[in-house]
């Protein structure tokens, strides 16, 4: 029996990719707490200049990731997903190492852009698992996998802050590079994939990819849903600490309270994603998606009327529980409506929409709060999510009518 005939242990692959997503999520968020401080250390002075450069180095990674994702997705469909995981982990490790050696802000900005170009571990992990797991377990598997990145993103800022306090800013980049190299080694030694490379001539072109989809309009609506999920999440990020300060008044531990309120949605998503993914396998991911979107609207509106930080924390915890179902439901529906032959590109297109949402969300939140105040951000975000719920419901209804 040749190696390619040996059955894939998808459960082991799920465990290893979960660890990889955890390490990648932690690595990305390790440097986030002190990013403005590092920008300042590289010679940027003045309040407005510091704000501008901090925003640039943050957003340029997502911008270049959105541009590069379709290319890497196409290459994954040609060469396999494992090799893309290896490329991403090793590439990001090298870039993080170089970031710790940056001597000026322009070098750092270019390296942040390069990080976006070479990224893509998590969407390729999703594509790998989506093509290996039995279809009736897709929701549970992708929901479980999503908790890896969420867990890493939750622990990363805490670990990054502690490491920066003890060892300084530059060593954290070297530690982050080591974490990503461990991710590379785990992928190299423990993930298995039976993949027959496809020649460039045999690759489906974009039109053929669209034609091969079971429901192209529904897939587009799922991409838009991914974008709006990230816009809704990102729109609140720039104003959260200031809003908490407005609610809390003059307290000494505002940083702790803000950090706790920022992290509770992630904790809730961590708890809810596998369970709601499993429920989606039973009743259908489309029902989970629509209900979670409606619940999100109903939770966002009262956030604009809260009077204490703890009321906001409770609502954000419940919002996180609902949000934990959204991306896994979208990904499961993408699996149902595409073939393994194009999975890499479909998940990479979805990642591009996610990255665009990561860039536009904070810009939208900052613009609305500057013109209308903090509370207006929650109302506008609720309106955007409500539009998406109606749009998604209409797309899913058309699909159901077409089937009937």
UniProtKB/Swiss-Prot annotation:
It is found in: Cell inner membrane. SUPFAM superfamilies: MFS general substrate transporter. Gene3D superfamilies: MFS general substrate transporter like domains. It comes from the Bacteria. Keywords: Cell inner membrane, Cell membrane, Membrane, Transmembrane, Transmembrane helix, Transport. Signal peptide: none annotated. InterPro entries: MFS, MFS_dom, MFS_MdtG_subfamily, MFS_sugar_transport-like, MFS_trans_sf, Mutidrug-R_MdtG, Tet-R_TetA/multi-R_MdtG-like. Coiled coil: none annotated. It is a multi-pass membrane protein. PROSITE patterns: MFS. The chain crosses the membrane at residues 19-39, 56-76, 90-110, 113-133, 144-164, 171-191, 222-242, 254-274, 288-308, 317-337, 376-396. Pfam families: MFS_1, Sugar_tr. The keyword Acyltransferase does not apply. One of its GO terms (molecular function) is transmembrane transporter activity. The keyword Transmembrane helix applies. GO terms for cellular component: plasma membrane. Belongs to the major facilitator superfamily. DHA1 family. MdtG (TC 2.A.1.2.20) subfamily. PANTHER family: MULTIDRUG RESISTANCE PROTEIN MDTG. This is Multidrug resistance protein MdtG. It comes from Salmonella schwarzengrund (strain CVM19633).
